[in-house]
Amino acid sequence: MVSVSEIRKAQRAEGPATILAIGTANPANCVEQSTYPDFYFRITNSEHKTELKQKFQRMCDKSMINRRYMYLTEEILKENPSVCEYMAPSLDARQDMVVVEVPRLGKEAAVKAIKEWGQPKSKITHLIFCTTSGVDMPGADYQLTKLLGLRPYVKRYMMYQQGCFAGGTVLRLAKDLAENNKGARVLVVCSEVTAVTFRGPSDTHLDSLVGQALFGDGAAALIVGSDPLPEIENPIFEMVWTAQTIAPDSEGAIDGHLREAGLTFHLLKDVPAIVSKNIDKALVEAFQPLGISDYNSIFWIAHPGGPAILDQVEQKLALKPEKMKATREVLSEYGNMSSACVLFILDEMRRKSIQNGLKTTGEGLEWGVLFGFGPGLTIETVVLHSVAI
C-alpha cells in the first residue's frame, strides 16, 4: 500500500518554479503623450475647460511617459459618445468592447510566449488569466482556452479586478502550481484594456484625471514550470520566495468601483509615501534569510504606478538611478498597464541583459526583487534568482 506522504512526494517538483518564456502584445493604436491632452479634451468635448486642460497637460508632462497604446481609437470613441462623458451610464458599451478585446490581446501575447518556449501547447497544464476589466461568464480564461485551442481539461484560474499589484499575484500562484504539480507547465496571462476606465474630465475629481494621464493597454504572457528540460527549455528567472501584505493604515489609498459609468479609480495623494514607508520591511523579510541588506546589489522590477512612487522608493532606500532603469523604460514606452507592467519589465530586463553582454538575465546580478503595488494598499513581493546567459 502506497502512503499519502509517498504520493505527495511523487506529485511535487524538485526544483524552483522557473519562468521559461515571455511574450508581450499591445494594440496597434499608439498615442504620443505630448499631444494626448489635445486629443483627450477634443474627443470628450471639453475644450472649453481651459484651466483643467492646462492641469492635465502638466500631469502628462510630469508623467515620464512618452507614449502609450490604446484600443480606444478616435473612431471607436465617436461611435460611443457615452464613454467620453464623465459619468454617463456606459457599462454595456464598455463591456461589449473588453469581453472581446481582453482575451484577443491576451492571445497575441500568449502565442509569442508559447513560440519562445518551443514546446507544443498540448503540454500546458494550467492557465492563470488576470484582468482588471470585462467581468463575464464564462470568463476570459475560457475564451483564451478556445482562442488558443488548448486542451479542454487545462486547469484554469480567473482573476478579475485585482488591479496593479496582480502581476506579483499571478507569479505567486504560478510558483505554487508549478512546484506542487510535477511536470506542470503554467500559462500566465495578464491582459489590460483601459476601455473600462476611460472617461471625460471633471473639475471636482482630479484623481480620475491622474488615471487618464497614466494608464495604457497591454498584455503579457509567461510559461512557468519547475525542472526545465535540458536542451529544450531555456530558463529566464527562478522564483524563490513570494509574499503578499496589506500596508498598515492604508485603507482607501487606492480604490476601484464598478459602476454604470464603468470602472472608477480613486487615489489618495499619499500613495507614494505609503509604498516607500512599507517597502523596507518587505525587503528585510524577503532578503534577510539570504544575508542581503544592500539593495543596490540586487536587480529591481517595481510596478511603475507613476514616477512619484519610483522617486520616493529610490530616495527611501538610497537606490542608484540605474536600479530602476528597466522599470522607467517600460513606464516611458507603454505607460501604466496595471498587472501586465511587471511582466513587461521582466522581458525588458532579460533582453537588455543579453544585448549588453551581461553575465545573467538580471543585469549581471544574481538576486533580484519584483514588487507589485495596488488597491488595498496591497504589496506583492517576489524574490527572483537570475539565470546565467
Curated annotation (Swiss-Prot):
Catalysed reaction equations from the record: (E)-4-coumaroyl-CoA + 3 malonyl-CoA + 3 H(+) = 2',4,4',6'-tetrahydroxychalcone + 3 CO2 + 4 CoA
Active site: C164
Any Pfam family the entry gives: Chal_sti_synt_N
Family matches, as Gene3D superfamilies: 3.40.47.10
Similarity field: Belongs to the thiolase-like superfamily. Chalcone/stilbene synthases family.
Gene label: CHS3
Keyword annotations of the record: Acyltransferase, Flavonoid biosynthesis, Transferase
Described purpose of this protein according to its UniProt entry: The primary product of this enzyme is 4,2',4',6'-tetrahydroxychalcone (also termed naringenin-chalcone or chalcone) which can under specific conditions spontaneously isomerize into naringenin.
Pathway: Secondary metabolite biosynthesis; flavonoid biosynthesis
GO molecular function: naringenin-chalcone synthase activity
Origin species: Pisum sativum (Garden pea)
Biological process annotations from GO: flavonoid biosynthetic process; polyketide biosynthetic process
EC number from the UniProt entry: 2.3.1.74
Protein name: Chalcone synthase 3
The protein's enzyme class: transferase
Transmembrane segments: none
Source organism phylogeny: Eukaryota, Viridiplantae, Streptophyta, Embryophyta, Tracheophyta
